[in-house]
Amino acid sequence: MDWKSMLRTGVHKPGALTAGLSVFLTLVYVLNWVFPINEKILLDPGALRKLQLTRLSLYPLAHLSIFHLLLNLMSLFVPLSMFEASHGTVFTGITLNLLAIVTGVVYCLVGMLLYPNVYVGGASGWCFTLCGYFAVQEAGFRPHYELASLKMPTLYIPLVFLVLVTLLMPGSSFVGHLIGLGLGYLIGFRERWLQMATPPGWLIVKIETWLDRWISMIPSVVKYHRESSVDRTAGYTPLYQESELPLHNDNFPGQGRVLGP
């Protein structure tokens, strides 16, 4: 499965978790206009010391502006749907929660020393984690991408995005994004560690069996990826097939490739 086919209506339905999370993030943002939700879930560097578990796990749901929300939704939708399709809906949900907690803990440990009064929120940490993860997977097939005479190592492309986001949006959390990206690289290189930190597949299958009645009620416009239908050991399919990559130029003696989508 490639990312472009997911954007073609009717070819691949978005994952149930991906679609549901997009709706839920939007709902939380709207409800925050009426109820002070963000005040309760924004990540405070002192949350770890105060054992505020709500802040440590729910801060990705908080968004400070409509631009912040839309940017994260657009950045998250395709890579998360790809990850969900290859790893399963429940497994992906557990992974997101685990990533939020680990990122939050590391952010607090650093923040208590460097920025004790800086609160953060938003799903951009997940975006950078997925970006790092897929960069590692893609680099195994294509170590470099070329644009004109510029050759960019595939593994470094997320770092370029990180720098650009930091420069264009100076109010964003560089440390939070860096932690998220680092976790993405870690999962990409050591995905077995993620498997060890999550419930075994047989348990997820059992839970899905218990919840089968409710799972069957999920609208058909999205796809629920059951644990029994995914194979997390299957090989990765690169974003671009080799036949899609060449960009010929009579004035350029080599072969060019598009950078990114």
From Swiss-Prot:
Transmembrane annotation, as ranges:
17-37, 58-78, 94-114, 116-136, 155-175
Q: What class of enzyme is it?
A: hydrolase
Q: Which GO terms describe its molecular function?
A: serine-type endopeptidase activity
Query: EC number(s)?
Result: 3.4.21.105
What reaction does this enzyme carry out catalytically? Cleaves type-1 transmembrane domains using a catalytic dyad composed of serine and histidine that are contributed by different transmembrane domains
Similarity section: Belongs to the peptidase S54 family.
Q: What is this protein called?
A: Rhomboid-type serine protease 2
Chain's gene name: RBD2
